């Protein structure tokens, strides 16, 4: 089975085309600046790279050109569109309705549109991508894989906020969590590497990209996660504040004469390590570099970043009453030996964790980074959300399922 995986953002589309018999990537790429001047597609097959620069007025336009590349004689994955068996879509928010990946029909589309108010920046472009693929590849099944679904079985004690219950009933205000596809892939892969029974294990997954979150995965289910009603809660991120005292919002509105939207923008776009370094950078590579040179501002930002991560790891060990393994993933998690080492040595040595410096100093390569006598194993596991989406799509189509339960 050949599956095209599509991830539609507001002005970009990431895609991968996979042969699921071998789980090999046939070709992949990125369409960017959709609907704005300078739009282009960067397409790759093996070691070949093609850049197509042409106007793309909307997502349908962009996906039409993507499909042309997928069947291109030289850089495509197949010769004919009929060889695309299914399309898997990343969808950010499934609300409370979707606890697993689903085969898309009109009923599902209505539900996705209904839940768009919970993810107004992300769900609408996801929906545009689905509609476009239905039109461009009529008769080809489409599957939605949700960022929120893996966390949907959290107990109420983990997902409810201590605000008047009527707001949960009226607006479904609760913890949803995000990065679920990544946390699911990394936790499963961690269990495989260590030879653990996934459904009898306690794993903490630490997804550190520009957006960052941690999940407590117990017996194969996410029982808690650091992101909440939106991706703003939890860890200190590139530009997001993570956890703050909620009264700071009203305080800033009053003192600075700001609207709710302006404060929201500050917390989402101007905070995190960007805010802590007074606008220097939101990129942890820049901050690490300066911190290692002795810059006190960047060193403090790195300390705050690592301290918050360590606190969440400690909290989730308590939530699961123990831990078998901790796995780092995503851009920072995979490529920052110093972050992994400092978190484990400065805060988690009480667990009997012993980092193997030689193993830890390798970037982006799947491995155990602790010594053989480390009581708790720590791993570097590169995430692969596209493969997870393709696997779900294949399983749903081959088994004739309407919905996949994790």
From Swiss-Prot:
One annotated GO molecular function: magnesium ion binding
Q: Which InterPro entries match?
A: Ac/propionate_kinase, Aliphatic_acid_kin_short-chain, Aliphatic_acid_kinase_CS, ATPase_NBD
Question: Pfam families from the entry?
Answer: Acetate_kinase
Q: Which reaction does it catalyse?
A: acetate + ATP = acetyl phosphate + ADP
Residue sites binding substrate per the record? 90
The main location class comes to cytoplasm
Q: What is its EC number?
A: 2.7.2.1
Q: Where in the cell is it found?
A: Cytoplasm
Task: Indicate yes or no for the key word Transferase.
Answer: yes
Cellular component GO terms held in the UniProt record: cytoplasm
Name the domain of life: Bacteria
Write down the PROSITE patterns for this protein, in alphabetical order. Answer: ACETATE_KINASE_1, ACETATE_KINASE_2
Instruction: Give yes or no: UniProt keyword Calcium.
Output: no
What biological-process terms (Gene Ontology) are attached?
A: acetate metabolic process; acetyl-CoA biosynthetic process
Cofactor(s) annotated in UniProt: Mg(2+); Mn(2+)
Indicate the residues that form the catalytic site: 147
Instruction: Tell me the protein family, please.
Output: Belongs to the acetokinase family.
Main role?
Catalyzes the formation of acetyl phosphate from acetate and ATP. Can also catalyze the reverse reaction.
NCBIfam families per record? ackA (TIGR00016)
Assembly and binders:
Homodimer.
Record's HAMAP family? Acetate_kinase
User: Per its record, how is this protein called by name?
Assistant: Acetate kinase
Q: Which organism is it from?
A: Fervidobacterium nodosum (strain ATCC 35602 / DSM 5306 / Rt17-B1)
